[in-house]
């Protein structure tokens, strides 16, 4: 869920967050509202996240740093170790506490159709971000990036 109240935005990640469920978050990152001053990401109910989710969170952190966005990850728990393992923990400010979602819900606005091209583009962008954030991720994800890039091109041709 993505919500807002004036210039404050909140994101609640729940369950198992993966390449299929993180596309709206990538879209939010790529269209970060100019009025955003503060962002809270609540991971209290996030059971697990895959590398695509961690890459999209890293995209958000890097975008936030550039735009001087006050950003914090709440209640990361074991997910913090996952971020640390990929060398991107340094991008985040971690806190514990309660987050009460804001009243204006941006996402989900309704049911969205699964889009293979958007999912593939999300996987590609996320893993490219992980590699640029920490070069040691090249060895981990270089093949993923190359295969996904080919998938994206194939999906574009089939349109």
Predicted regions and their residues:
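Histidine-anchored nucleotide/phosphate-binding helix
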Residues: 55-61
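STAS-like cytosolic regulatory interaction modules
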Residues: 1-47, 62-159
């Amino acid at each position: 869920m993505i919500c807002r109240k004036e210039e404050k935005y909140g994101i609640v990640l729940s369950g198992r967050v993966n390449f299929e469920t993180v596309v709206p978050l990538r879209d939010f990152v790529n269209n970060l509202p100019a009025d955003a001053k503060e962002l809270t990401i609540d991971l209290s109910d996030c059971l697990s996240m895959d590398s695509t989710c961690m890459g999209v969170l890293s995209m958000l952190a890097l975008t936030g740093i550039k735009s001087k966005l006050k950003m914090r990850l709440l209640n990361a728990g074991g997910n913090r170790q996952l971020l640390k393992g990929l060398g991107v923990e340094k991008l985040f400010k971690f806190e514990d506490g309660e987050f009460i979602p804001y009243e204006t819900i941006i996402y989900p606005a309704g049911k969205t159709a699964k889009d293979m091209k958007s999912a593939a583009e999300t996987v590609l962008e996320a893993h490219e971000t992980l590699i640029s954030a920490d070069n040691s991720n090249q060895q981990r994800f270089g093949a993923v990036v190359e295969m996904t890039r080919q998938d994206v091109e194939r999906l574009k041709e089939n349109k």
